[in-house]
């Protein structure tokens, strides 16, 4: 299991073994094929489509004004994805599409998320085949004292952009820290 405590400052808690990578590759091949066939039942279900079309419509201007990001923003017609538009880590080397719809309703948000699953499988497949051997953790001191200053970092997560703004006074604990979770913005709509 890869839980939240798997990721560490400087790397990850442990390396992925070849058995896991092989099983993941097999699972992804099956999942990619099943997504289209299984979702066809839901996508073509007249009742589902009728109940989600034109429901909870969010236009692009309102989404931008309210700070909406991620699939909710892309379902409103704004094709912004931090991984593509302000690339970080290995994303510049990966090929993926940014699913976007213009309707802004619940159906559009659902369809964007389904396409995001397909793109995630595509990204994972590329990374699995290109993952280099070597250490999975940087050699860092147990206690890190950053220089005094400010820093902001952001990543594209499944619900939108997650950001952390930190102010350091040079000690081992942040002087100030603000964590931005996209769900907080989305709950206000």
Question: Where are the language model's segments positioned?
Answer:
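Active-site bordering "gate/hinge" segments
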Residues: 1-189
């Amino acid at each position: 299991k890869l839980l939240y405590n798997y990721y560490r400052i400087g790397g990850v808690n442990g390396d992925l073994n070849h058995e896991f990578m092989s099983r993941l590759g097999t699972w992804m091949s099956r999942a990619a094929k099943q997504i289209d066939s299984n979702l066809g039942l839901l996508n073509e279900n007249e009742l589902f489509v009728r109940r989600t079309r034109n429901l909870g419509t969010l236009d692009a201007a309102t989404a931008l004004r309210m700070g909406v990001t991620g699939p909710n923003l892309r379902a409103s017609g704004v094709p912004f994805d931090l991984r593509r538009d302000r690339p970080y880590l290995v994303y510049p080397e990966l090929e993926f599409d940014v699913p976007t719809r213009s309707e802004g309703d619940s159906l559009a948000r659902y369809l964007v998320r389904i396409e995001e699953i397909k793109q995630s499988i595509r990204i994972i497949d590329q990374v699995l085949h290109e993952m280099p051997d070597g250490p999975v953790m940087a050699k860092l001191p147990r206690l890190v004292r950053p220089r005094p200053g400010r820093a902001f970092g952001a990543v594209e997560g499944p619900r939108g952009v997650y950001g952390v703004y930190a102010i350091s006074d040079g000690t081992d604990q942040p002087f100030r820290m603000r964590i931005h979770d996209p769900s907080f913005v989305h709950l206000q709509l």
